[in-house]
Amino acid sequence: MRNLKNIMRRHISLLGFLGVLSLWQVAGLLKLLPKFILPTPLEILQSFVRDREFLWYHSWATLRVALLGLVLGVLIACIMAVLMDSLGWLNDLIYPMMVVVQTIPTIAIAPILVLWLGYGILPKIVLIILTTTFPIIVSILDGFRHCDKDMLTLFSLMRAKPWQILWHFKIPVSLPYFYAGLRVSVSYAFITTVVSEWLGGFEGLGVYMIQSKKLFQYDTMFAIIILVSIISLLGMKLVDVSEKYVIKWKRS
């Protein structure tokens, strides 16, 4: 009995998830919910199998754009964070504008970027950069602010140059904060890519979702939503794995 309780306690999340899926499937079989509102889990699974080639093709297209935008966003965010930390006037100038941009919904910015930059890959990349830089910049700046003041004084007394203080002290201290922001930005990157694909294009999960909607393939639409969630979760998991290898001292 005790072993059974321990097993249930360890796997309570899995049991709850399976319970929800079971109720969902039963509700669908009893036709309590129309298919266009909520297809059954079995129908969504069948869609994964039936449309696997299309899902793979469009997933790879979305992944390419998301990764490119994320890499550029991370590079820009790191450079901006260092400059804003070093130059107080730059921080006072840029930070309020960044906050204003973050308050504007992504779906509202996307059409403007398409109008300015066309229907190619450029507006998608710009949109991803706009959504992914802010969490990383804020996290890195927060890490810089948590640097020990006594250590900074010690570096100054040792006549260390600014780049030496940055490389040997500030960056190592801010790495955990950087990874916290990176987790958020990874999920933003994939979601933003799909949103940008809604506005037009020839490939990508967002484009495929719109096509499925027009064909009333609601099971495929839900399969795409689940696939985007899985990709985002895998991306966040990769960030966790990377953090464990990069910041080995954090475990101790």
PLM features per residue range, with description:
Residues 1-18, 237-252:
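Transmembrane alpha-helical segments of polytopic membrane transport and secretion proteins
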Residues 143-181, 205, 209:
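Short cytoplasmic-facing helical segments at TM-TM junctions of multi-pass membrane proteins
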Residues 115, 191-228, 247-252:
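Glycine-rich helix-loop "coupling/hinge" segments at transmembrane-helix boundaries
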